Amino acid sequence: MLRRRARRVQEEDDPLDAAQERRVRAVLALGGVPQADLPDGVQQVRLRLLERAAKGFEAPRDVSAWAAVVASNLAMDWHRAKKRQERLGERLASLRQHEHPSGEDTSVLSLAVAQGLDELPDQQRQVLVLRFFADLPVRSIAQELGVPEGTVKSRLHTAVRALRARLHEDEVV
């Protein structure tokens, strides 16, 4: 009984609901953060949301979008701190956390996409992950990053073209 009550109180105080936490985890994982560091990344997002409230700032209009952008920024910070090659295997493992029965083709495609993401510039990778993996609309991405919508669209276009070229170059698709 006490555990249920404690859990309920904890859930009420948690600035992120379960769906937002899953989205943050996905953005971090797709941004290259290793599985072992995902809980720390989620805690960082929670902490930043609580710090924002403690400083008297209004809550973000869309907490889910705000949290996804913060998670994306954390992933970019992590990228700057580590060499990309060291974490490629960990990243693929985190993407396969919820494995579906699949063939060798899917594994090859996953590896090629991960390598393609690694080769993109940080800003292009960020908007690509936020748009297609966090499922944020262009307008939300632009607002959260503080850039014009046209800039987001341009980065998306360039990133998709580069990723598509990489996949065709490797004869994956």
Predicted regions and their residues:
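A short, charge-rich alpha-helical start-of-domain segment used by transcription regulators
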Residues: 1-29, 35-42, 50-53
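Short amphipathic alpha-helical boundary/capping segments
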Residues: 28-30, 34, 112-121
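Arg/Lys-rich amphipathic alpha helix in sigma70-family domain 2
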Residues: 55, 69-90, 99, 106, ...
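DNA-recognition helix of helix-turn-helix
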Residues: 72, 76, 139, 145-170
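Helix-turn-helix DNA-binding module
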Residues: 118, 122, 126, 134-151
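Short helix-capping/turn signature of helix-turn-helix
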Residues: 20-21, 31, 129-137
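Acidic, proline/glycine-rich intrinsically disordered inter-domain spacer in sigma factors
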Residues: 82, 93-118
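Structural recognition of an alpha-helix C-terminal capping motif at a helix-to-coil junction
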Residues: 40-47, 51, 61-73
